Amino acid sequence: MWWPYLVLALLSGLEASGFPRSPLRLLGKRSLPEGVVDGVEVYSTKISCKVTSRFAHNVVTTRAVNRADQAKEVSFDVELPKTAFITNFTLTIDGVTYPGNIKEKEVAQKQYDKAVSQGKTAGLVKASGRKLEKFTVSVNVAAGSKVTFELTYEELLKRHKGKYEMYLKVQPKQLVRHFEIDAHIFEPQGISMLDAEASFITNDLLGSALTKSFSGKKGHVSFKPSLDQQRSCPTCTDSLLNGDFTIVYDVNRESPGNVQVVNGYFVHFFAPQGLPVVPKNIVFVIDISGSMAGRKIQQTRVALLKILDDMKQDDYLNFILFSTGVTTWKDSLVQATPANLEEARTFVRSISDQGMTNINDGLLRGIRMLTDAREQHTVPERSTSIIIMLTDGDANTGESRPEKIQENVRKAIEGRFPLYNLGFGNNLNYNFLETMALENHGVARRIYEDSDANLQLQGFYEEVANPLLTNVEVEYPENAILDLTKNSYPHFYDGSETAVAGRLADSDMNNFKADVKGHGALNDLTFTEEVDMKEMDAALKEQGYIFGNYIERLWAYLTIEQLLEKRKNAHGEEKENLTAQALELSLKYHFVTPLTPMVVTKPEDNEDQTSIADKPGEDAPYAATSTAYLTSHQSPPTPYYYVDGDPHFIIQVPGKNDTICFNIDEKPGTVLRLIQDPVTGITVTGQIIGDKGSSPYSRTGKTYFGKLGITHAWMDFRIEVTTEKIILGTEDELSTFSWLDTVTITQTGLFVAINRKKNMVVSFGDGVNFVIVLHQVWKKHPLHQDFLGFYVVDSHRMSARTHGLLGQFFRPFDFEVSDVRPGSDPAKPDATMVVKNHQLTVTRGSQRDYRKDASVGTKVTCWFVHNNGEGLIDGVHTDYIVPSLF
């Protein structure tokens, strides 16, 4: 049972190509703010956790600034639970956002292969220890520039030993001016307890930095240490924030079950309390081959002795040891009486290593022993059987073919009881152990070779030590529920919880009934939950302040998780179908899974660098870095096209290392078609505004774009951007945001990020990326008013049929400039340009690129084409006038 676990670290280093600065140059330098390490200041780190009904939505945001006088590489590291799905990542440099795009693995694989062939690979996500996988991305940041990293991931919190636990392992590695962990919890059942603690700080110091509270359905935890509280000593400049921050809570349970319904999706939680424990019949099948010698066998003995101390007198048990052959403690199961337990301890203390690894015969002997006990009625009728195997290697004697061992075990068990496989260390075929466990209603777990391996073994036993119900079935009215997640379980263990989710066939349903049936220690039990939809709506109204579609996403999370699990031991057409279902949902709900990596494009030295974040499997050794398809490669420079200012159209021509620009002089209110692609269905239009008080009939004076329209015909999606607000969605369902918002919106094939008062990014999958810049002027300015700039950052997925004032230039074209001569302005020479079979007189000038700085911009020199771009654009500029934005 994995718990939410997150490690945060931010590192900085010298640019690879830079030389160490002379110490003499540092003398007399101005002092840098505290928290600056190697020229980079991490001035803000916030971990925002929003939990609604066990479903956690976590956002990790780190902001840094390069205070050095040269470029620096800044890295962002987050360790997150292996069971979590990354849902979003954005990298923002000087106000320009670069989003991550989630895509099918086959597409990303091509980029991986290309990078490998070029010798350029670097992992974004890789396995990292027992419960974690590490997300890492780095970027070169120019002197004086700021960078923001934001990672979002989601996970269903599992109940373990009677509580939900969220671990945040914090490692900023330097003092951070604004460091905060902020967790909001909403539980419709009501919160019964909430606590938080940190392993890296004393309770006295923690108390002043930590606030925690809960009342009714809401809980809140905030940890905001000051700079002084972060210091490892009163005069130190290094941070003591290095350890676990733990949030623990549980909920009220007036009844064993709880059903919640939102927007046609439901989740059904089930966790009965106070039931007597079902006696268990347990066989431990232990590998004692030569590879278990030393600490492994010693730790195994310690763990088994502790397990014997926890056995209940109603339980039955036996030990089977396998090496080259098979040895049993007793010929059959025996009751856990005090005398038998003492004899068992003597046997365990005598266990020693020898021989090879005969997994097949060891397992079959244990299965036969449990089967015989049930058939011969030597164990209680109302009891449950469990087999636990521990091995540290692969079968190498007897039957050693993994597929044949799986077949033998499957036929022997016949679904009667679960098999739990524990893999000790890394030198084994974990996929084999996991597949065999899953197809026999169990799970596999890796036991890590460490000083606490015995505690890991004990911990697993404690999870299965107290079954309260067996053969659990969750039932709903026939034809009322669609797309149901797993609803049958061989056992329900004390302190845990089952979660079943699905979709209502009729969203107008007034009520429905949910039954949970299972075999208890004394009798068969049925737990019924009556769901009244009106009462449900009233009870859940408060949850809107967290996030409203949480049950639908929870359902998607569970469904994908279970499809991927089934896929592990499926074959042929069944595996193809499971893969297709999981892939479709992963793309729809924007989850990074083993089928859907995330591609992150970031700027590196005027080139785009593409990195791929894949999700590694448990079979990957956690120290390895080459087990996942995680790549980084350099792609050719991307040409840019934009319109900003008066309005100035700027076209950077690939292969020419030069830029062309032109103006369109039209009266305010005119709408121009900027881009139209009939293949992708993407259209962009812009409406012209003038200075304050300008006449709608006048073409004189400065004009700008005050409104932009973006549509995607095939997605039935549109965006209207003004200097005041952003309206987006389908024609029937529109959402409105202001430029005061900071918002990220994702759905399949779409990413939108609004950066407060700066810009917004619009991406249609990988290969179509626009940036809209907001220019704000003094509100009381007598002449000028706010306006917009439109930038095409990436267009390589647009088709060859794309047209429009900007779109026509996405296709390759050439031009030649000659006869450079003095112009009417000595600072702006004239020249002759030959382009598209036209000979034009052009003037050298400069415009501004405002993507990184909307107030000052970056100077761009260009050849200016006069007369509304005549001779450069296809046709005349009036051909591009359209009646409206949409």
Swiss-Prot record:
<dbReference type="InterPro" id="IPR013694">
    <property type="entry name" value="VIT"/>
</dbReference>
<keyword id="KW-0165">Cleavage on pair of basic residues</keyword>
<keyword id="KW-0722">Serine protease inhibitor</keyword>
<keyword id="KW-0325">Glycoprotein</keyword>
<feature type="propeptide">
    <location>
        <begin position="19"/>
        <end position="30"/>
    </location>
</feature>
<comment type="subunit">
    <text>I-alpha-I plasma protease inhibitors are assembled from one or two heavy chains (HC) and one light chain, bikunin. Pre-alpha-inhibitor (P-alpha-I) is composed of ITIH3/HC3 and bikunin.</text>
</comment>
<keyword id="KW-0646">Protease inhibitor</keyword>
<feature type="propeptide">
    <location>
        <begin position="647"/>
        <end position="886"/>
    </location>
</feature>
<feature type="modified residue" description="Aspartate 1-(chondroitin 4-sulfate)-ester">
    <location>
        <position position="646"/>
    </location>
</feature>
<dbReference type="InterPro" id="IPR036465">
    <property type="entry name" value="vWFA_dom_sf"/>
</dbReference>
<dbReference type="Pfam" id="PF00092">
    <property type="entry name" value="VWA"/>
</dbReference>
<dbReference type="GO" id="GO:0004867">
    <property type="term" value="F:serine-type endopeptidase inhibitor activity"/>
</dbReference>
<feature type="glycosylation site" description="N-linked (GlcNAc...) asparagine">
    <location>
        <position position="88"/>
    </location>
</feature>
<keyword id="KW-0654">Proteoglycan</keyword>
<dbReference type="Pfam" id="PF08487">
    <property type="entry name" value="VIT"/>
</dbReference>
<comment type="similarity">
    <text>Belongs to the ITIH family.</text>
</comment>
<protein>
    <recommendedName>
        <fullName>Inter-alpha-trypsin inhibitor heavy chain H3</fullName>
    </recommendedName>
</protein>
<dbReference type="GO" id="GO:0030212">
    <property type="term" value="P:hyaluronan metabolic process"/>
</dbReference>
<dbReference type="InterPro" id="IPR010600">
    <property type="entry name" value="ITI_HC_C"/>
</dbReference>
<keyword id="KW-0964">Secreted</keyword>
<feature type="domain" description="VWFA">
    <location>
        <begin position="279"/>
        <end position="439"/>
    </location>
</feature>
<feature type="signal peptide">
    <location>
        <begin position="1"/>
        <end position="18"/>
    </location>
</feature>
<dbReference type="InterPro" id="IPR050934">
    <property type="entry name" value="ITIH"/>
</dbReference>
<dbReference type="GO" id="GO:0005576">
    <property type="term" value="C:extracellular region"/>
</dbReference>
<feature type="domain" description="VIT">
    <location>
        <begin position="26"/>
        <end position="155"/>
    </location>
</feature>
<dbReference type="Pfam" id="PF06668">
    <property type="entry name" value="ITI_HC_C"/>
</dbReference>
<keyword id="KW-0732">Signal</keyword>
<comment type="function">
    <text>May act as a carrier of hyaluronan in serum or as a binding protein between hyaluronan and other matrix protein, including those on cell surfaces in tissues to regulate the localization, synthesis and degradation of hyaluronan which are essential to cells undergoing biological processes.</text>
</comment>
<feature type="glycosylation site" description="N-linked (GlcNAc...) asparagine">
    <location>
        <position position="577"/>
    </location>
</feature>
<dbReference type="InterPro" id="IPR002035">
    <property type="entry name" value="VWF_A"/>
</dbReference>
